[in-house]
C-alpha cells in the first residue's frame, strides 16, 4: 500500500470517522421508523391549511356554535320592495283566521278555472328554533284583501322579483323587476259606476282566452280583487289586467272594473309577471 493510502486510513480512523458512522446509523434508523408509520418531530407538523379549515389553524376551534333561537309564536314579515313570495298549493290547503283557529276556507290544487291555486305570502310565524309553523297569506276571495293562515307543508314557496303598480289617475300600468321599471303601458280603467277596486292584491291566475283576438286580447292576469259593485257577476266579478280589441279606448275610464292595456304590452307583461306577483292599485 502506498503512503497516500496509509495516510487515508489513519485519517479516517480518527474520531471523525466514528461520528460519521453514528450519523449514518441514525439516518438509517429514522428511515426504518418512518417506513413503519412513525414520524420525526419535523414530519409530525401539519402543513398550513390554505382555506382555514384545519383544526390546528382555526381560531374558532373548540368554541361552542351559536344556535339560532326565536321567540315561539313570533311573526316575521316576508318580502321587500324587490322580492316577494308566492305559495303554490300542493294538494289541498286550509286557511284559518288565526293559526289553528276558526277555519276560513279550503282550497284545492287547482282553482275553478283549472289553474294552480296560489297565495301571496305576507309573513311567517316561527317556533323557538326559527322554523316556520304558519304562513300568513292573502287569499283570492272576498272581501278584497282578506288574509288567512296556512300550514307550510301544504304549499311550495316560490320567490319572485316582479311587482306591478296600477295608477288609476295616470291611467298607467307599470312593471318592476328587482325594483327597476321595465315596462309601462297606458290603460283603460273602470267607469265611475263600475270603478276599479283600489288596494294591495296579487296575480292569482294567468289565463289565455280561446279567442286571442277577442275583448281580452292574448291573455289575462287575474288579480285577487273583485268588483265591489258587480256582485252578481260570474265568480263574484273578479278583476284582471288583460288585452283589448278596442285599443282606441286606452287611457279612458270605460271598463267594468278590469284594466285593459295594449295587446303587445300585455304579451310582455304576461311573460314576466308570474302568479303571486304583488299588484298595487292606487287612485
Indicate residue ranges for each PLM-predicted region.
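A structural motif detector for short, solvent-exposed N-terminal "entry" segments of globular domains
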Residues: 152-190
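N-terminal secretory signal peptides that target proteins for export/translocation
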Residues: 1-18
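C-terminal motif of bacterial Sec signal peptides marking the signal peptidase cleavage site
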Residues: 33-35
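Boundary regions of SH3-family modules and the immediately adjacent low-complexity/disordered segments
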Residues: 44-82, 138-166
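SH3/SH3-like beta-barrel superfamily modules
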Residues: 111-153
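Bacterial signal peptide processing site
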Residues: 37-39
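Exported/periplasmic cell-wall-interacting domains
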Residues: 46, 141-142, 154-163, 191-202, ...
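Beta-loop motif signature
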Residues: 52-127
Amino acid at each position: 500500500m502506498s503512503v497516500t493510502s496509509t495516510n487515508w486510513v489513519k485519517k479516517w480512523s480518527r474520531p471523525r470517522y466514528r461520528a460519521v458512522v453514528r450519523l449514518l446509523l441514525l439516518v438509517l434508523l429514522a428511515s426504518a421508523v418512518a417506513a413503519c408509520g412513525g414520524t420525526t418531530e419535523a414530519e409530525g407538523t401539519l402543513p398550513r391549511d390554505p382555506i382555514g379549515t384545519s383544526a390546528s389553524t382555526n381560531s374558532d376551534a373548540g368554541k361552542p356554535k351559536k344556535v339560532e333561537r326565536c321567540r315561539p309564536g313570533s311573526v316575521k314579515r316576508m318580502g321587500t320592495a324587490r322580492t316577494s313570495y308566492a305559495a303554490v298549493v300542493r294538494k289541498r290547503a286550509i286557511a284559518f283566521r288565526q293559526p289553528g283557529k276558526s277555519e276560513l276556507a279550503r282550497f284545492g290544487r287547482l282553482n275553478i278555472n283549472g289553474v294552480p291555486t296560489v297565495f301571496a305570502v305576507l309573513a311567517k310565524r316561527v317556533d323557538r328554533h326559527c322554523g316556520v309553523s304558519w304562513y300568513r297569506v292573502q287569499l283570492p276571495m272576498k272581501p278584497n284583501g282578506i288574509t288567512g293562515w296556512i300550514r307550510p307543508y301544504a304549499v311550495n314557496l316560490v320567490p319572485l322579483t316582479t311587482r306591478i303598480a296600477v295608477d288609476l289617475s295616470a291611467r298607467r300600468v307599470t312593471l318592476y323587476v328587482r325594483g327597476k321599471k321595465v315596462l309601462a303601458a297606458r290603460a283603460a280603467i273602470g267607469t265611475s259606476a263600475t270603478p276599479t277596486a283600489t288596494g294591495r292584491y296579487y296575480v292569482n291566475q294567468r289565463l289565455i282566452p280561446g279567442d286571442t283576438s277577442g275583448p281580452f286580447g292574448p291573455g289575462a292576469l287575474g288579480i285577487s280583487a273583485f268588483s265591489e259593485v258587480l256582485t252578481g257577476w260570474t265568480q263574484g266579478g273578479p278583476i284582471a289586467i288583460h288585452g283589448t280589441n278596442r285599443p282606441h279606448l286606452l287611457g279612458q275610464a270605460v271598463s267594468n272594473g278590469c284594466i285593459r292595456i295594449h295587446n303587445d304590452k300585455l304579451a310582455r307583461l304576461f311573460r314576466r309577471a308570474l302568479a303571486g306577483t304583488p299588484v298595487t292599485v292606487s287612485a
